[in-house]
């Protein structure tokens, strides 16, 4: 049996030989440091020096094709033409679930929370060490590989709700409903483990990530939004049940 250290080393080696990373950073010194550091780790790295070029690269099917997609975006917030927050927000609005690591010189809790709330998966404050950036990239890539390796060819059905993982699509009583990326991830997690009770902290870790710095009440807000879209009577929920003193369960 492989030891945990050997398994981790093997997984990191597999990630480095396969992962394709886009770096969108306008400061040449920082961009070159990131690109060179990631290439030394074995990743295939591409870069853009403004938000518009980065967006065009992400939307170019010849560059970001379904059979050879980008695996991670490292995105500065203060970018010319299209800023990082708007780019992140646009990608999530389009249903793009690629992991996004945001870089910023803004270190306040408000700025970090804003970056995560618009769809970033992680937030790293400048100045940072290359070692920490690489470690965060590995963590995001491991999570992405796990998601991709999870069988997604079966439709998940619970009473009147159907979730189609390959299409990131949900129908309720036969009608398609529009969910934000976080709402979709919450519902997918709940439907993967029906009747399991999840605490707010567990939901934060699974959906927002362990580095989330906001209030756990954001879970309650997203649950309320989901109930409004799923339940016949949100005040008497049939699907998303509050388990007082513990958290929430589905069904």
Curated annotation (Swiss-Prot):
PROSITE patterns: OMPR_PHOB, RESPONSE_REGULATORY. The modification 4-aspartylphosphate is found at residue 76. GO terms for molecular function: phosphorelay response regulator activity; transcription cis-regulatory region binding. InterPro entries: CheY-like_superfamily, OmpR/PhoB-type_DNA-bd, Sig_transdc_resp-reg_C-effctor, Sig_transdc_resp-reg_receiver, WalR-like, WH-like_DNA-bd_sf. Residues 153-251 bind DNA. Residues 20-141 form the Response regulatory domain. Keywords: DNA-binding, Phosphoprotein, Two-component regulatory system. GO terms for cellular component: cytosol; protein-DNA complex. One of its GO terms (biological process) is regulation of DNA-templated transcription. SUPFAM superfamilies: C-terminal effector domain of the bipartite response regulators (SSF46894), CheY-like (SSF52172). It comes from the Bacteria. Pfam families: Response_reg, Trans_reg_C. Signal peptide: none annotated. Phosphorylation. This is Probable transcriptional regulatory protein SYNPCC7002_A0851. It comes from Picosynechococcus sp. (strain ATCC 27264 / PCC 7002 / PR-6) (Agmenellum quadruplicatum). The lineage of its organism: Bacteria, Bacillati, Cyanobacteriota, Cyanophyceae, Oscillatoriophycideae.
């Amino acid at each position: 049996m492989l030891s945990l250290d050997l398994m981790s080393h093997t997984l990191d080696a597999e990630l480095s030989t396969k992962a394709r990373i886009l770096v969108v950073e306008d400061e040449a010194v920082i961009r070159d440091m990131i690109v060179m550091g990631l290439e030394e780790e074995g990743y295939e790295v591409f870069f853009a020096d403004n938000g518009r070029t980065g967006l065009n690269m992400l939307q170019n099917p010849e560059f970001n094709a379904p059979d050879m997609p980008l695996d991670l975006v490292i995105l500065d917030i203060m970018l010319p033409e299209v800023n990082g927050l708007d780019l992140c927000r646009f990608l999530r609005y389009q249903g793009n679930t690629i992991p996004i690591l945001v870089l910023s010189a803004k270190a306040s809790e408000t700025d970090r929370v804003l970056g995560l709330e618009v769809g970033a998966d992680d937030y790293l404050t400048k100045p940072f060490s290359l070692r920490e950036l690489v470690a965060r990239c590995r963590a995001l890539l491991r999570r992405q590989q796990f998601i991709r390796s999870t069988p997604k060819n079966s439709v998940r059905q619970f009473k009147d709700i159907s979730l189609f993982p390959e299409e990131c699509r949900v129908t309720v009583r036969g009608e398609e409903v529009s969910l934000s990326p976080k709402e979709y991830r919450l519902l997918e997690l709940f439907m993967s483990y029906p009747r399991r009770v999840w605490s707010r902290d567990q939901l934060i870790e699974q959906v927002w990530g362990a580095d989330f710095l906001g209030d756990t009440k954001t879970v309650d807000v997203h649950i309320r939004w989901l109930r409004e879209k799923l339940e016949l009577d949100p005040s008497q929920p049939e699907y998303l049940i509050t388990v007082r003193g513990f958290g929430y369960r589905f069904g």
